[in-house]
Design a protein with these regions (language model features):
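Charge-rich, well-structured scaffold segments of protease-associated domains
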Residues: 1-169
Length: 169
């Protein structure tokens, strides 16, 4: 197990953040590796079932049952869209920020999630989850240059800076 003191992932309309913290140097480096690998080299390219489990898929438990849509994100977003507070917050963002990414719900509208196809999902990842479109923040009692050199050597140097053109609108 990990000795982390904080580990999470959060999505926003214009970013995804992966904050981690550990008082143990070896554990911190391990968590950094896990996250860097998961973000820049995810299994989604080799295992389409991840998209089906996490995104959406059709499900039929018994042959007499009605065919239904299921999936982790799909079900989470159904919950978000049924919460009055979240509905109000969403309409507020649409009204205040009509020409920005904040007009969108980062998880997607449940009614439209089943329209997303696997290849579109992969294209989205290739475009937005790229080092040229990221910030990496380090803080704490560490040799920052050593960490930056490590991140460059093990991860960042394998990507070209001109691979991705970003338009957040």
């Amino acid at each position: 197990g990990s000795l982390n003191t904080f580990l999470n992932a959060m999505t926003y309309p214009d970013k995804t953040v992966y904050p981690v913290a550990s008082c143990n140097d070896v554990d911190f480096k391990n968590i950094m590796d896990v996250y860097m690998d998961a973000v820049f080299y995810p299994d989604i390219y080799n295992k389409p079932q991840i998209f089906k489990q996490e995104g959406w898929h059709y499900e039929l438990e018994n042959e007499d049952d009605e065919l239904k849509i299921n999936g982790v994100v799909y079900n989470e977003m159904k919950g978000v869209y049924s919460s009055p507070d979240d509905v109000l917050s969403r309409y507020t963002c649409v009204s205040l920020f009509p020409d920005t990414p904040y007009r969108f719900e980062s998880g997607g509208e449940p009614a439209h999630i089943p329209e997303l196809e696997y290849n579109e999902f992969l294209d989205y990842h290739k475009k937005f989850y790229h080092p040229v479109n990221s910030y990496i923040y380090l803080y704490g009692d560490m040799d920052v240059q050593e960490r930056l050199d490590y991140l460059d050597r093990e991860y960042l140097s394998y990507f070209d800076a001109d691979d991705v053109e970003i338009d957040a609108s």
